[in-house]
């Protein structure tokens, strides 16, 4: 007899929605994430197709460069690349990333809808904020990505994962700027892609589980938190202190989190990796100095070539949305 039949009673429900036993019995799994480094179980990805050819030549400006910077005169660096990606190489590198995740025990769920694919759908991280018990779907700030949420809702529902909410109204929020820090704490970075109304909606949904949300103001030069902060072990984080406020650095110190600074000699998106399990990280192979730093500090690194992927304006973290982690 299926375990859910044990709940066939007219007794009032006394457990909260996120009760692990209830989730596993009714929804098939505990779903969601309580911490950012637990062993990956399921990850949502999208293998890039011909949709990427719809982008303009300087496509990286759309994803990694804040649109606000287009209104500022003068010389400054933005995270763009001077050429469009080669689709065949892009697919090969994406496949290699997926293979690396499978070797770490992850099941890949593909978001495939090439007929209706949006140009930047490869960056599945932005589709939602995965929290204990389910996902909060994003509302994108740019029209070029706006339709991705509908496709994500369909695929995530098909997988059987609870959708706990969706950013609505005039709120905007994207998953690349969100992470669970521990079972009681989450962090969101505010930028032109994540506004106060979006943060308020995330905070309200998290409050049902008693989870505190820390909102970090990001500089105008970046759009997502994952360009500046990545947990790599239970008590270790890779950071770019030039992109984070002092009080957040102090908050991490107060939690006894050891901070490792991404090497400025490495490519910009070196920090944009993913923890496959505690102390084991998949990282861009081009970030040799940072890889050396991580290795010397007890973090195992699985290098993957993303030289073509970054031409789209994103990295490894951007291409992966874990739906379930251990712990």
Regions found by a protein language model. Give the residues of each.
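The feature marks the mature, well-folded catalytic cores of soluble enzymes
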Residues: 1-327
């Amino acid at each position: 007899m299926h375990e859910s039949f044990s709940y066939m009673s007219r007794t009032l429900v006394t457990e909260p929605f996120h009760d692990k036993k209830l989730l596993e019995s009714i929804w098939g799994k505990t779903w969601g994430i309580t911490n950012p480094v637990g062993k990956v179980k399921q990850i949502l990805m999208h293998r890039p197709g011909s949709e990427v050819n719809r982008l303009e030549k300087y496509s990286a400006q759309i994803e990694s460069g804040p649109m606000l910077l287009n209104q500022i005169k003068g010389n400054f660096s933005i995270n763009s690349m001077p050429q469009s990606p080669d689709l065949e190489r892009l697919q090969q590198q994406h496949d290699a990333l997926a293979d690396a995740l499978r070797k770490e025990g992850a099941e890949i769920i593909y978001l495939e809808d090439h007929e209706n694919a949006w140009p930047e759908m490869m960056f599945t991280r932005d589709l939602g904020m995965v929290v204990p018990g389910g996902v909060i779907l994003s509302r994108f700030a740019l029209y070029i990505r706006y339709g991705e949420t509908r496709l994500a809702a369909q695929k995530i529902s098909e997988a059987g994962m609870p959708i706990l909410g969706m950013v609505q109204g005039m709120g905007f929020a994207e998953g690349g700027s969100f992470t669970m820090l521990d079972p009681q704490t989450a962090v969101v970075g505010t930028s032109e892609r994540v506004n106060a109304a979006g943060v308020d909606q995330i905070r309200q949904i998290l409050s049902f589980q008693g989870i505190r949300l820390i909102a970090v103001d990001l500089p105008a030069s970046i759009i997502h938190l994952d360009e500046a902060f990545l947990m790599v072990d239970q008590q270790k984080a890779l950071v770019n202190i030039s992109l984070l406020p002092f009080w957040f650095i102090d908050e991490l110190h107060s939690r006894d989190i050891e901070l490792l600074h991404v090497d400025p000699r490495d490519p910009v998106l070196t920090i944009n990796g993913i923890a496959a399990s505690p102390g084991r990280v998949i990282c861009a192979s081009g970030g040799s100095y940072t890889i050396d730093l991580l290795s010397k500090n007890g973090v195992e690194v699985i290098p993957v070539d993303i030289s073509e992927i970054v031409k789209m304006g994103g990295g490894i973290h951007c291409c992966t949305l874990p739906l379930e982690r251990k712990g």
